[in-house]
Amino acid sequence: MRQPLLVRTLWPAVVAAWLCSLLLASPRASGQTAAARGHAALDTSLFTHSENCVACHNNLVTPSGEDVSIGASWRSTMMANSARDPYWQASVRRETIDHPARSTDIQNECGACHMPMSQRISAAAGGTPNPVFDHLPIVNGDESELHRLAADSISCSLCHQIAPDRLGSPESYNSQFVVKPIPPGASRIIYGPYQVDAGRKTIMRSVTGYEQAEGPHIRESTFCASCHTLITEAFGPGGEVIGRLPEQMNYQEWQHSAFEKEQRSCQSCHMPAVSGPVRISSVLGDERDTLNRHVFVGGNAFMLHVFNRYRAELGVTALPAELDATASATMRQLEHDTARLAVSVPERTGETLAFDVDVRNATGHKFPTGYPARRTWLHVIVRDAAGGALFESGAVEATGAIAGNDADLDPLRFEPHYQTIRRPDEVQIYEPILGDSKGAPTTGLVTATQYLKDNRLLPR
């Protein structure tokens, strides 16, 4: 089979509707100013916009001629566009509509990973609420530095200021990483994986206000664990907490994989290192070995195409070619590095043809992992000698639905796990299905209290 495994997270037909509803519902669409929203006076000096970093960390080329510019690579990733993601925006909107009494809590919790700089700034101001939709729609050239930092998503000065304190511990989960405040009269500390000489430290401090520090933790899986371990609270009708759910457990899955024993970190796959020396700055930069590409390839090629198609509506700054390149790199990883599939020699008994399909996870986490809307399935076709289809399970329809999938026909049903597929309307789908407190299927993250199904492939 040429395409036995397919991953989809979204139906194209509904993207335009999401964008329309978000723009119509956003408070910012009314022309409300930053001062009117009460954010103008907040101190934003802890973070800096990525454009200030890109000025020096672009135009980086390997000896073989590969462009590994950090800024150009990063700005076309899901990390750089986490605040622009319309699927995420629609999900937050849905959760706040379902649980209005918890609207502020939901927006702060979701913004902690998707709009982390604006959320941290608001929290440092004494817990000032930082509603997600105060920053939407994203408008390039916005008058407020807080909004610019919100739109900058998971940016340079956010990740590189994360201190090693408590990383990998339960206290760090749900984005509870440590970014230390600026001591009076001191410079902000910016971490990188390399030793720093005094001369370049002085140059960096005088130009940017940041003081470089060696931080090996930035290459460890514990560094990723804070945002990629998410335990959600489930809310009842009045906003009361009625349960907790391990919604995303990428780090714990990695801990129980061969990758942890082999000391293969998250970064080794999602930020593959350059082989050979390369300058890490276009201004007086040293050549360094094993520079990690800031490509952050993952499981979401589709959304990268959405960013290209709706550039103006979503305030996208990455160039079309950059988004296409990142989407292509994501698809290459999905096609070649995620799973191994083998089909046995078919056995015929009368009019019945039987064969085994062996699917093995090749990653260091569940496949698929992360956000529980992701699914992977088998698309199986049996053809006759002339190429005609005798049997097909798992076909993709024009709407993006999977033919025969119960959940695509009725949201209160879902496809069970199969040991044997006998009919075209039986489809092997590896996925999590969330359930509410009454045992009914739900896609609401803060409505869910349990898993009704989780047959995702376990880590290698």
Where are these predicted regions, by residue range?
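Bacterial N-terminal signal peptides
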Residues: 12-25
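Boundary at the C-terminal end of the N-terminal hydrophobic targeting segment
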Residues: 25, 29-31
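Primarily the internal scaffold of c-type cytochrome electron-transfer domains
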Residues: 33-37, 60-97, 127-460
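N-terminal catalytic scaffold of extracellular/periplasmic and nuclease hydrolases
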Residues: 53, 88-109, 119-122
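Conserved, well-structured interaction surfaces
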Residues: 112, 116-123, 134-135
